[in-house]
């Protein structure tokens, strides 16, 4: 196991950005940066032993300061959408910044992904720390948060989120990596298969993607990934939910006890033989098929387009702060926020 640190550019404020490269005993490589606590690269040996970068991203830290698609981003304090960019907490209306169709998406334009984090290098892990002051993004409470990326010797990237606030607040963090198991520059993911540990999903009310509040069964619909299925098989089906969102961009409620750590998704690319198993203790996962990627210039000259990747964002249900049907993402003052999501890679 080795860890290397190198320059990765400069922020608009003149701060030095660093890139940390962790390599395990199998030759698998994980690259993360202290700008946004972002996952930059995951290089996995394919069935022929060729190192293959399976996450989309950019070559330079400067590029991540725009990062409209949220490549590899640590999202916080809240992932996904909050209707009307507002909610009530302890009888008080909390107003956030609307940044998508009048709603708040991924905590707004000043999300954690656009901030410098303090980095600490460990034997096989990089820990990133951030102090989020009371009122940052509109959320109450001083929130001290740590995100630790660990590369294990069984070829897993573990992401551990920890935090504590001095006031009741919202804590619903996630990682927005875009995966392509054929390689980040290999084109669309239509032929790659996906299986989700979910028999229900949360339908959205319209193209603004706020859930209706109901849990709908996936059975008999294109939303059924209870068995491995090619991502492209039904993505353009004549199905209202898919037409509203331009393809898969939906929250699936995981079939497991609340708080239990269990598998959420399994994906596979026959071309490379690379498989990925994802695990979490969160109640749900957003499956997004990169429907809105368009001519995005990425790593090593790659150009990323529509459906060239997929995201599996562990989370509380979208807009849960405004919908008591769902598990609530509120963190009590003085209590510890502690959640883990793991992406493990293997060859089949």
PLM features: residue spans?
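An exposed, glycine/acidic-rich loop-and-rim segment of catalytic or binding clefts
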Residues: 1-348
């Amino acid at each position: 196991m080795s860890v290397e640190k190198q320059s990765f550019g400069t922020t608009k404020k003149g701060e030095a950005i660093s890139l940390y490269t962790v390599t395990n005993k199998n030759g698998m490589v994980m690259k993360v940066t202290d700008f946004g606590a972002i996952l930059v690269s995951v290089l996995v040996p394919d069935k022929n032993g060729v190192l293959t970068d399976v996450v989309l991203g950019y070559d330079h830290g400067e590029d991540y300061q725009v990062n409209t698609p949220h490549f590899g981003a640590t999202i916080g304090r809240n992932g996904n959408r909050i209707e009307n960019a507002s909610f009530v907490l302890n009888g008080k209306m909390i107003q956030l910044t609307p940044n998508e169709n009048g709603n708040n998406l991924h905590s707004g334009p000043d999300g954690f992904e656009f901030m410098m984090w303090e980095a600490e290098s460990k034997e096989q892990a990089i820990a990133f720390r951030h102090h989020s002051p009371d009122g940052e993004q509109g959320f109450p409470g001083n929130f001290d948060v740590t995100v630790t990326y660990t590369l294990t010797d069984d070829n897993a990237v573990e992401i551990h989120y920890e935090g504590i606030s001095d006031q009741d607040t919202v804590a619903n963090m996630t990682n927005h990596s875009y995966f392509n198991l054929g390689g980040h520059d290999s084109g669309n993911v239509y032929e790659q298969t996906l299986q989700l540990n979910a028999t229900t999903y949360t339908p959205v009310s319209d193209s603004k993607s706020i859930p209706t509040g109901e849990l709908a069964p996936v059975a008999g619909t294109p939303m059924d990934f209870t068995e491995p299925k090619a991502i492209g098989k039904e993505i353009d089906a004549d199905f209202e939910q898919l037409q509203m969102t331009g393809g898969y961009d939906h929250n699936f409620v995981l079939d497991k006890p609340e708080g239990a750590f269990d598998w959420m998704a399994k994906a596979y690319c026959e071309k490379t033989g690379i498989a990925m198993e994802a695990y979490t203790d969160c109640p749900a996962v957003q499956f997004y098929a990169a429907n809105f990627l368009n001519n995005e210039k990425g790593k090593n000259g790659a150009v990323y387009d529509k459906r060239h990747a997929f995201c599996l964002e562990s989370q509380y249900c979208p807009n849960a702060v405004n919908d008591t049907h769902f598990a609530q993402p509120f963190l009590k003052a003085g209590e510890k926020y502690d959640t883990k999501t793991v992406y493990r890679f293997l060859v089949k």
